[in-house]
């Protein structure tokens, strides 16, 4: 039963209950009110309804269970009525055998409870029979007494549990924390714990023999009653407990006082609950599984692993407490703030890793160490192997030819990333509020090794000014690349740009849904099946994709997204009337819908819990309320499967914005957006089309006005953040913007406006590629050579319809999808993938098939649209007959499917094949591979960031140490430096000088060498035993450090990287995270989810060495004509989300060794 983040009635009003934790204990409080202990007021009276439901569920089985067991459901309802509606009349007659199957196992036997200090018991089946025979409910009084006793006992336990849910620091530790601390010294010294004593005291061997003696119950068909068997195992454990802890009358005080024995016992309980669950579970044990899990050795080994994992987690928690300087006045609000900060830090760490990889590609693409490290950066500069052309791709101009100026430029980009990374890696308390306040950077020279340079005194100030001045050009170029200029008249575009003032920044209200979610949600609501459950939002603007050709649909999508983000959102989230109207409409329609579906339950509708927007509410106030409720509901339902239930507050917010955007688009000024028409002559050459587009772009530039309000080009901190943003791609910039918006809400006093504007400015040109090859290549041959690895050898691309060479037969065409892979360093990897299989290359056969398909594709799209409309009409006709309850069904939809279903599917497959060929001809598939690679590496870097965080917390736990680590450091390397270079001063050893300090902050000097050597030895032993689990194996220790660096620095993309495949790195990452089993297991799920997001089903399996291997990688399915995955295969009409050929490429990406 939940007592937190739920609503209760108090004084006639609904109030949200929260748990407020402190170091002295916890208490229930009301949300939005001064903190006051309401625990006794809420429990049990204000949760009476929940307690009643709890007792009902303990008494009888659930309705679904009765159906599943094929019991008499009518008889179930008769029995249920006795307990659920105690004021209603009893049934006229009932037999014991009609009651017993519906009682939970506990109530099928005599039930014991305590009344007035005396043990009582009753047989519920007999009570019911007697009560029915006498038609006297007073016969059920023993059951009502049990219910009163149960609620009071449960309530007292809940109160005690809440009170004990304190924040554990060093004082007032829980029994579990005390036990873990008792084992900690042994564990950190050896990397293991010896449980021999507790195996003996707990008599584990005896327990396992008792468990093995429990015989499974079978039905008349020989099928095991799993639930009854698992209850039997639980009963055996309960019978074993008195032998260890004694009974209430004769307790074993010594064992009961042993905290470690108590925790050992709890682990045994959890073991049985996990492998032999009584609650509904997907686990299905075979006979071999049962034999294995009931072995004494299996139980002992598992418990040891679980306890070791818990000890590590406790060490990390202690380090976290020390790191954040949590004191006795710490509350749950402080913990929420820390959690929010950590989420932001981890996200920003991944962003910094991506930016650092881009710096490495510019400065020294063979560097496998940390390019942001000062020593490694200097070594790379000395190679003088910088890539000025690549630098210009990011900043618009190449590096200076003057050596000093060039190095200042490079130190500037390093400083912009390195300082942000260092700030977030070592943040404490409120440090994140100033994480972006960077004005100077290291710029050492021979004469001044510690020289600092201000960003306002660099070339980056002029470049920032230039970027601000060119916003109209960037905006116009975005309209061109998005397809707006190709599919809308200049007159319409000019009218739109001059009539409305587009905002540089979208709304900064957190939880405002993104365009994709609103767009897809609107399409689903507007075009859903119009039956009795049709949800009417009176929408008009969300037209289906099938209504448009591919390119015109993309242009319309771009325009709608632009209008939503830069016009609608800023206005809608400040126009109180429009916002309130949408809120009121959605709530009204939701109530009407509930009444239509179930007229008897007028009070029960999905958004009943959402309070109306009052006249006193501002938009910000109301959204803050909705946001608070949404977060609470997310927490409440976080343990459920995501698809199992849709959160009402999330759905409410989505509908408000869907309706609001639909209303906004009804203005006549937007009519043209729904009717994209090609503006270029179809027969024109690619060069002619490009020239025409450039002319159209130039003609609207003057009208493209986006004016920044907060970004200042003379502010050094703004310039530094601008440099940082220029090193990111559009995906990372968008994610950073979204995270900043969310994070800003937790740090209200810190202003983010200028950061958000700078991000939006950089987004305008982030992934823009020059269209003239001369801006990127020194010759035509070099440009064409860039394409050759991806094209079939010997193919004559000069005859491929201006796809790769212009109509003059020699001028190359720039392909943005290729150039972006060059910019972000994945080109060599993509070449390797494509070279794995000749079918991966773009071939003459691909061109011929694509060229042929082009001639009929528009007609086929129209044919698919017509078929779909016919099916919708047939389905609606069937629904109408259903509503009219006609006896004889016409089955219009089924007849349509029988006649046209296969044709419809063939057309869909043909269109999908054309789209795949079109993607190959324009290298879109390479861009997707590039994006997937960056996401995979970024996700792995995110796990390494967690490893680094926990590494640091491990050190912070050793608060009494004379020396501390400030982050990840190769202790083996330092140890060698200390012992092999005795003549050097310690302060000259880079790693020690910068990574290790004394607690009091003094510099380490020669006089403490012996102490330092002993410290390093002790620290290495501590980490190797307790964290890395490599004992004294120096080779394995170094391998783990190398793997950490390999993943953290994106070394998978470098020329000199070690010979790893991505699946190898996933396995190595799991090994790195072995210290936290939950985190280790999360690795594979994270990558399965990532491929799912990209439209693929990734299945992994463990080989004989317990290493993950790819079992299969297949496309996800899209179901058509009302079919679903639940239908029999012969009734499924489905196509693939992605082509199998693309899945094969992605599998090569995973398995290919670099």
From Swiss-Prot:
Comment field (misc): Part of a type VI-A uridine-preferring CRISPR-Cas system.
Entry EC no(s): 3.1.-.-
Functional summary from the UniProt entry: CRISPR (clustered regularly interspaced short palindromic repeat), is an adaptive immune system that provides protection against mobile genetic elements (viruses, transposable elements and conjugative plasmids). CRISPR clusters contain sequences complementary to antecedent mobile elements and target invading nucleic acids. Unlike many single-component effectors, this CRISPR-Cas system targets RNA. CRISPR clusters are transcribed from pre-CRISPR RNA (crRNA) and processed into crRNA by this protein. Cleaves linear target ssRNA in a pre-crRNA-dependent fashion, preferentially before U residues.
GO biological process: defense response to virus
Domain notes: The target ssRNase active sites are probably within the 2 HEPN-like folds, and the 2 folds interact in vivo.
HEPN-like fold 1, as annotated region: 330-466
Protein name, UniProt field: CRISPR-associated endoribonuclease Cas13a
UniProt cofactor note: Pre-crRNA processing is metal independent, while crRNA-guided target RNA cleavage is dependent on divalent metal.
Gene behind this protein: cas13a
Name of the top EC class for this enzyme: hydrolase
Regulation: Target RNA acts as an activator for non-specific ssRNA degradation.
Keywords (A to Z) from UniProt: Antiviral defense, Endonuclease, Hydrolase, Nuclease, Repeat, RNA-binding
Family indicated by similarity: Belongs to the CRISPR-associated endoribonuclease Cas13a family.
Organism: Paludibacter propionicigenes (strain DSM 17365 / JCM 13257 / WB4)
NCBIfam families according to UniProt: cas13A_C2c2 (NF038188)
The protein's required cofactors: a divalent metal cation
Annotated region described as HEPN-like fold 2, given as residue ranges: 923-1154
GO molecular-function terms, A-Z: endonuclease activity; RNA binding
